[in-house]
């Protein structure tokens, strides 16, 4: 399967390629938008390096070594704000969780179903 996407955001952004090898999890690769971290600074600057360190927690998409992929896209609807007394997770951490821990699509669904989702930045999102 091939997956493609664009970054046609309102504001200019720098896409950072993120390779992650979590201890006890699956290796993955994906992109983070540095403007979501408050900077588009060059990586040779202090601000750029600080943003790059946060890249694994600001990914917009990725695929892990098992072939599980996840992409987040924005919606024009009321932001998700579940409250069913489950542990809370936000959009970025949901992506990290799936990439690090899911070996199949069903595992990804099961992992995410264990949390109350809270959308970030006042927007609503969906995953594919």
Model-identified regions with their sequence ranges:
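Alpha/propeptide regions of enzymes that mature by internal proteolysis
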Residues: 70-72, 76, 84-116
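Internal, well-folded beta-alpha domain core
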Residues: 110-128
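A contiguous strand-loop segment
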Residues: 1-86, 122-123
